Amino acid sequence: MRFLIVILGMFSTLAATAEETRCGWLENPSPANMWLIDRDGSWDISVQGTSNALDDKSMELLYQATANENEFVRTNRSYGFSCACLTVDVDEEKSSITTIHKSKQLPLKQCLEDISITKDIPLPFK
């Protein structure tokens, strides 16, 4: 019986840290502020003035999702937003992304045509 409880506990831990793919607006409006807005809401990645929980590999993958200047909208000098899919681990309780495993910048058109996030386009004047 104890063995079964231990095994179930191990599987629940694995499920809690399972990778998931989230796609939406990847917003970087100012230094050290970055989040992803998808159909489920806003996911904090980095917030100025708080400790950054992401490792260097995650940060590199994150910036790859904004690398194509033709699919990046500048809203504040070199800051702005793109459309991206990130394969991540999340802390659902804090609505934050804790690790990034993969990233892919998408055409802006893809987010514009996604009715679940079109209204959330991160334009400063809307």
Question: Model regions: which residues?
Answer:
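Beta-strand-rich cores of mature extracytoplasmic or soluble domains
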Residues: S58-K126
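N-terminal signal peptide c-region/cleavage motif recognized by signal peptidases
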Residues: S12-L14
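N-terminal secretory signal peptides
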Residues: A18-E71
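Positively charged n-region of N-terminal signal peptides that target proteins for export
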Residues: M1-L4
